Amino acid sequence: MGEFFADLATALPRLLGDGLQATLISFAGGAVVMVIVAVALGVAGHQGPKWLQVISRVTVEFFRGTSLVVQLFFIFYFIPTFTGVDLGSTWTAILALGLNYGAYGAEVVRGSLNAVPAGQWESTTALSMPWMTKMRRVIWPQAWALMLPGFNNLMVMLIKGTAVVGLVLLSDLTFEAEQVRRQVGTWPAFIAALIIYYVIALIVSTIMRVMESRAQRRLGLGDYEIRKARKDAANALSGGTAGGAAGGVLTPDAASLIPDPGRGERDA
């Protein structure tokens, strides 16, 4: 047992150095790209003209239907060969992770927009709100609160997805664990990596849950409404319709849907 902990102590510094840094950079960059891609494709698939919806759907299905490993190799080898632009290992990892998980995130965005009650859309139309004002002041605050649980799951999946970026010569946590394994054995190296991955996922998940709670409190949602809103979003993602989600989870008065920054504090 003493030898095990000695080997574990040997493994940790290397894993917490270059390995952890590469993993965190890949995750942070991939998360930014993922959110941008998810919002762009999700809104286009829900609100765009027919031709834009088709492009959004084809793009989503392409990145969801092909392997992340294949996408990594495609970006790493194909783009430099045919364009002369060498992205390097780090940018290849960020781009591949962002596009792959962004395609899944697009369905989270589209499903959350579907889950906003139909009465809210009708209210904004009756008030002749411009599209940008409608989305920013009424629709998006509701949809954002419904998106966060799905984005929470995707963030955790993204963290685990960084384990394959070593295939494009990036010295991430898993790559460094494999190097340490050759020196001190399998158990210490990968137990250390497991603990580090878990801690990262726990921190990210906690932050996302805090964001989710704040977004829902700003809309004045109680525990029952929060659970029902989550269920409606899940139904929309699994093929439900907006009509099925329009059960009055949120107040139908469009004016009352404008987020009140002080509401959360007053409710508390």
Question: Which residues does each predicted region cover?
Answer:
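Transmembrane alpha-helices and adjacent helix-loop boundaries
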Residues: 1-268
